[in-house]
């Protein structure tokens, strides 16, 4: 039955060690890039709309290069003996570190953190080929859909959480235009 297949996927050690952190990485990136980046740059960093637009363009271009580049690079490196899971973990670590830099307001007008965010934002999708090698061939679509559902649930939770914190904090009137 379908329930049995999903339980087999979720109980797999590789799934429950890799999928949650990958889903969290994807969800945090989707949340920041899709909803909160513009507001953060305006309200926290105090950037103009022109400066914001340039940074959002940088994120979009870096995301495109990151998606293609990480896929090609992990394939190349895995042929040289580099473990795909370690590559994934390194990319996720970079993604989470740059998010900490945003939270701590480190170099708020810089470009480098937006480049790193874009390059590593979609790195969580590299979990799919890793996991698909651990299941029977018919399980891959269910594994991918389980991660996708988890990711989008986390997106909504993170969006709500950030919004809630910002509502408690309130706007900084000194940054108003």
State each model region's role:
Residues 67, 134-171:
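A late C-terminal transmembrane helix in Major Facilitator Superfamily
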Residues 67-82, 166-167:
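Helix-to-loop junctions at the C-terminal end of transmembrane segments
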Residues 16, 50, 85-86, 108, ...:
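Residues that define the loop-to-transmembrane-helix transition and helix capping
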Residues 82-127:
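C-terminal transmembrane helical hairpin of 12-TM major facilitator-type secondary transporters
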Residues 1-7:
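Flexible cytoplasmic inter-helical loops of multi-pass small-molecule transporters
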Residues 12-71, 121-128, 132, 155-163:
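Extracytoplasmic gate region of multi-pass secondary transporters
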């Amino acid at each position: 039955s379908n329930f049995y297949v999903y339980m087999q996927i979720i109980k797999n050690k590789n799934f429950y060690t890799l999928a949650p952190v990958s889903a969290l990485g994807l969800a945090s990136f989707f949340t920041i890039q899709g909803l909160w980046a513009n507001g953060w740059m305006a309200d926290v960093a105090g950037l103009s709309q022109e400066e914001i637009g340039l940074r959002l363009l940088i994120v979009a271009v870096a995301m495109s290069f990151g998606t293609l580049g990480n896929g090609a690079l992990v394939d190349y490196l895995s042929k040289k003996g580099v473990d795909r899971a370690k590559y994934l973990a390194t990319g996720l670590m970079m993604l989470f570190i740059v998010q900490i830099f945003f939270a701590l307001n480190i170099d708020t007008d810089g470009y480098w953190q937006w480049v790193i965010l874009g390059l590593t934002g979609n790195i969580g999708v590299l979990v799919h080929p890793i996991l698909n090698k651990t299941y029977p061939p018919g399980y891959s679509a269910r594994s991918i859909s389980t991660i996708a559902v988890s990711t989008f649930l986390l997106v909504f939770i993170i969006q709500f959480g950030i919004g809630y914190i910002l509502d408690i904090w309130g706007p900084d009137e000194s940054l108003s235009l």
